[in-house]
Amino acid sequence: MQDERVVLEAGPDGLPVLFERPRELVTASTPAGAQLALARLEQARAAGFWIAGYAAYELGFALEPALADLWQPGAPLLHFGVFDAPRPVDASAEEGSALVTGVTPLWSRARYAESFHAVKEMIAAGDLYQVNLTMPVEVSFEGSPEALWSALRAYQPVGHGGFARLGEEVILSRSPELFFRLGADRRIEVAPMKGTAPRGATPAEDDALRDALGQDEKNRAENVMIVDLMRNDLSRLARPGSVKVPELLKVERYATVHQMISRVVAELDAAPTLPGLLQALFPCGSITGAPKIAAMRAIHTLERWRRGVYCGSLGWAAPDGRAEFNVAIRTLNVTAPGRALMGVGGGIVHDSTCDAEYEEALWKARFVTGLMTA
């Protein structure tokens, strides 16, 4: 297991760390296997080891009994390593050269419109309030996965990126979004990201686009819906009265887009287990919609593709109870030499328009398409 490793940019002290030479790999491809795997990971953590790896979006079907019928056989639901303590790593180190040679949405605009209008009908019928509709995108590249991750990292610095090579899969994540951060004192923070606008060509245009996003009623409503969902998810574990929203509707700049973010914090009622945390919170509401179970059913019906690690989570957990996981957006799964699959999309609400949502989805691929000319 010499090649297996996980690099996470948001390590235990907020700095990049490397997990290498795992003592054990823990994976599962069925709901029953996932429950056993999570129990094994918790056992390893209790024995003084660290765990690091990733969970696929579809793990949510194994964790929520109301969604159990959606599971279909396929790729792993989770893949983690059991490690000794991580070591600091220079995440900016060069890994060779890489070039993106193609970025191809696997849905046509008409295919997207078909699912978009179906979501709008569900919203009009009162079945749900928001659905995070995504579509698959194929990426072709030259160079190693490590070199591609290095190039992506240089092009779009983010706070929650990661690289994982565990078994057969290689995952490259350039996520800017925190799923949850848990301290040894049982304080937990989530930071849902909802609302996107492109960067401007000039400083003045860029400021105008940022300000417009911050004032946009649709995006503000979309973000608040997910904040409410996350507050509800946290309340399943939190001490009564401890769930707070210290930051609401903040707009942050990234290399290719502006993003609207909020922050929710809570104090957990008891020392949580990793299975308990994921049972309450996974997957993150920002990539499902609301209500969560209804939105996930709609996604399963309308998308008809396996998201995999995209919209799942990469992260680590420590023996002392600390843990941090991202929301695996802007994330690629290397499927063959020189080929990878990712997803792009966004939240659909009652006043969304098809053309605007389709274009927003394409903006979110700029962290990759930018390397075609870099």
Task: Describe each PLM feature range.
Residues 1-374:
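Extended alpha-helical targeting/anchoring segments
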